[in-house]
Amino acid sequence: MSSMGVLDPNNFLNQIGKDKFGNGHGDILIWKRKAEKYLCLSGLQYTIIHPGGLVDTDSSKQELVLDVDDVLMKMEKKSISRGDVVNLCIAALTESGNRSVSFDCIGKQRDAVEGGDSSVVSAEEAFRLFLSTGKTADYTLGPTGSE
């Protein structure tokens, strides 16, 4: 489990723990990205989930949108139900098929989904559909891409 926004070194989460001059500890998303990159290079199978902001709402009520490389940071609403993240974790355990993958996820109101599809699919189906795209995060991007 990680966070959306790991590609932006100026993300506000990187400022937590720093003083007004930028000194001190911090850079939580940069450290998360470094850990992800280390895992990817380890040769172990993995699934890395980058949820948007976690909210305490009912799960399975919104369309799950999965993509990579902070594309979803451009969305106006960048949150997801904690329960939906749990369901995606379970789906990753049961549906990954020995494949390593890293993705971002948010929940979207049904009427806001492009194409007008008002169906809400399960986390398992959303994950399977995402896997069929062949996408995964590009770990050459971001503040640690050249290290």
Segment roles from a protein language model:
Residues 1-147:
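Oxidoreductase cofactor-interface core, primarily capturing Rossmann-like NAD(P)-dependent enzymes
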